[in-house]
Amino acid sequence: MKKILVAEDNDSNYILMTYVLKGSYEFDRARNGKEAVEMVDRSGYHLVLMDLKMPVMDGLTATAIIKERHPQLPVVALTANVFDIDKQQAVDAGCVAFLAKPVKLQNCMETIKKYIL
């Protein structure tokens, strides 16, 4: 089974993501960007779902570090900020896709399937 890291500090958003992933993927949770970087370094994930606004280390910084160390690992941005500048910052950090919150379940599944073969 493919393994996904969900980097999300908000409990409600994490519960929604577990609903999407349960049964199809193994998944772990990181509650901040620093934890996400550490977990990616220790485990073999196939994809990261990255909240961009988190404590300790934001998702953009965490994504840039992850992509530097693991360039082939797809990182998908999750954020309530949907302005063009936010999307561009996510791309610049290394995100391969951008999902706006609240996340639509079908869009999320399609995006995951696109990057996990």
Which residue stretches match the model-derived regions?
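C-terminal output helix
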Residues: 103-112
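Receiver (REC) domain active-site loop signature in two-component systems and cognate sites
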Residues: 54
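Two-component/phosphorelay signaling modules centered on CheY-like receiver
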Residues: 10-28
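Acidic, metal-coordinating helix/loop segments flanking the phosphotransfer/catalytic sites
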Residues: 29-47, 68, 88
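Conserved phosphotransfer cores of two-component systems
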Residues: 25, 41-43, 65-73, 93
